[in-house]
């Protein structure tokens, strides 16, 4: 009698079952990581806006503009547009900012969830550098 080498149907089904279970656990975890990576782009853009706001207030003093335009902050029209977030004037794209005081500087930058991002729905950056997420 010849001995056959290979896997039985049961062994192959067990392997497929194990791979399916691992995939069902790993995929939701990876989606959270993907959203987190996409938010990194928005946070980087918000950081640039925060720096521009501090410069704007330092240059203007008490004559600062509460909702400064892109050009007042030193940006061109497409400078705040990324892969996942649409830039533009405050409140037009995914970003909105407001300056409330010059001494000490007080402002907030709100980012709405961009293209293909599920959670959180928005993140706010305060002048203290604190990020607040809204689910």
Name these PLM-found stretches.
Residues 51-135:
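Periplasmic/extracellular, small/polar-rich flexible segments of pilin-like filament-forming proteins
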Residues 29-47, 60:
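Aliphatic-rich helix starts adjacent to a transmembrane/signal segment
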Residues 23, 39, 55:
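Functionally critical, cavity-lining and gating residues within the transmembrane helices
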Residues 16, 43, 50:
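Conserved catalytic core of two-component sensor histidine kinases
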Residues 1-31:
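N-terminal single-pass transmembrane signal-anchor helix
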């Amino acid at each position: 009698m010849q001995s056959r080498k290979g896997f039985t149907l049961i062994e192959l089904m067990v392997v497929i079952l194990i791979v399916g279970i691992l995939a069902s656990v790993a995929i939701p975890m990876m989606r959270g990581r993907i959203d987190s990576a996409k938010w990194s782009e928005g946070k980087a853009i918000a950081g640039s806006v925060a720096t521009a706001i501090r410069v704007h207030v330092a240059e203007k003093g008490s004559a600062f503009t509460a909702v400064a335009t892109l050009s007042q902050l030193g940006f061109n029209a497409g400078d705040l547009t990324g892969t996942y977030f649409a830039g533009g004037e405050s409140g037009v794209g995914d970003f909105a900012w407001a300056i409330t005081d010059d001494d000490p500087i007080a402002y907030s930058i709100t980012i709405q969830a961009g293209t293909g991002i599920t959670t959180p729905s928005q993140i706010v950056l305060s002048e203290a550098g604190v990020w607040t997420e809204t689910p």
